[in-house]
């Protein structure tokens, strides 16, 4: 559980966090941030681990994923399994295919399709997510995934493709309206 506060009132933060900890002993990871920007972005904020681990573990079809507070992971794991299975099925990835996973997060989809692909390249802007993607790939004994951190519109260029290879399959999750025009043009 990650609780976001606006006011940096240590006394009240500790009172609430202790209440949550005592009231819900099944919580294995209790974190908080103080975000005085009054918005819902937290990637530039410090995460404080109040109790337990600063991550959770998730299993999906035999793959194991460590997920930190700033790492993207689908919130409904059961539906994510269905989505990833369908993605793999529809993409018809073969052992000869180079796959790009744009907005890879913790590398979940990249690793999910890696067993069918020659190589998978994942890109995301969140450094913590890419670090977790590498850790997860190692944890899952997946050696054909490479991950890059950077702003998609800056990193996903002709030079990047020349260096890493022209993809046979590109996966974007989500296929967002907010995808920068340069990224859409590159695809």
Outline where the language-model segments fall.
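Carbohydrate-binding surface patches
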Residues: 1-8
């Amino acid at each position: 559980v990650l609780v976001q506060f606006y006011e940096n009132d240590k006394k009240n933060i500790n009172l609430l966090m202790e209440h949550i900890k005592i009231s819900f002993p099944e919580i294995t990871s209790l974190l908080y941030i103080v975000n005085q920007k009054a918005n819902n972005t937290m990637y530039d904020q410090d995460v404080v681990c109040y109790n337990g681990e600063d991550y959770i573990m998730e299993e999906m079809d035999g793959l194991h994923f460590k997920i930190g507070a700033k790492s993207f992971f689908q919130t409904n794991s059961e539906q994510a399994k269905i989505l990833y299975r369908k993605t793999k099925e529809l993409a018809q990835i073969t052992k000869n295919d180079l796959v790009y996973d744009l907005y890879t997060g913790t590398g979940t989809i990249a690793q999910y399709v890696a067993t069918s692909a020659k190589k998978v390249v994942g890109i995301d802007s969140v450094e913590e997510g890419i670090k977790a993607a590498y850790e997860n790939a190692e944890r899952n004994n997946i050696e054909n995934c490479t991950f890059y951190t950077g702003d998609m519109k800056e990193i996903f260029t002709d030079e990047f493709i020349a260096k890493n290879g022209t993809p046979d399959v590109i996966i974007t999750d989500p296929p967002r309206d907010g995808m920068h025009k340069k990224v859409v043009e590159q695809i």
